[in-house]
Regions:
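C-terminal interaction appendages of subunits in large macromolecular complexes
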Residues: 1-167
């Protein structure tokens, strides 16, 4: 069993030979073998069992670049990685943060409602973003620009259907 902390919050079932993926709020992720005790980043936003040959699991993310403050959206799959090496979902600049992340095991693409922080001359405070308009790329892709304005919150509007054809 995979647990988040000493209190024993159950996350998911796994075996002794499984590998896990841990993603932090600042955009770093690491894939590691299951051990009795493993230490990962602070501020974890996703922990799950990682399957190396899985091409159907698609991650949908919206992140803020730390250097420019521009918000990007991307859909990506993680297929080949080196164990215990740190990778980055964002562009890797200091101050970058993941604002929205979902792991969809069948390639689903959801729609989200984005609320922007109120600023002068900003007329549209609420916008919608549909992940099905994005192509599934590699983890190193930058993504598409969502907005240059500061995002206050993101909420799930609707779950989407799978964008990957059947086997």
């Amino acid at each position: 069993n995979l647990k988040r902390d000493d209190a024993g919050e159950f996350i998911c079932d796994c075996s002794d030979i499984s590998e896990i993926i841990a993603i932090s709020k600042d955009g770093h992720y690491k894939i590691s073998k299951i051990t009795e005790k493993s230490f990962f980043f602070t501020d974890l936003i996703y922990v799950g069992v990682f399957d190396r040959g899985d091409t159907r699991t698609v991650y949908n993310a919206i992140y803020k670049d730390g250097k420019t403050g521009v918000n990007f959206a991307k859909r990506f799959s993680i297929t080949s990685v080196t164990k215990d090496k740190e990778y980055d979902i964002t562009m890797g600049t200091p101050g970058s943060a993941i604002l929205w992340l979902t792991a969809n095991h069948n390639g689903e693409a959801e729609s989200v409602k984005i609320r922007f922080k109120q600023q002068k001359k900003l007329k549209k405070l609420i916008d919608e973003y549909d992940f099905s308009t994005l192509a599934i790329k590699g983890r190193t892709s930058r993504g598409n620009i969502v907005s240059k304005h500061t995002i206050q919150s993101i909420q799930l509007k609707s779950l989407g259907v799978s964008t990957i054809s059947g086997k």
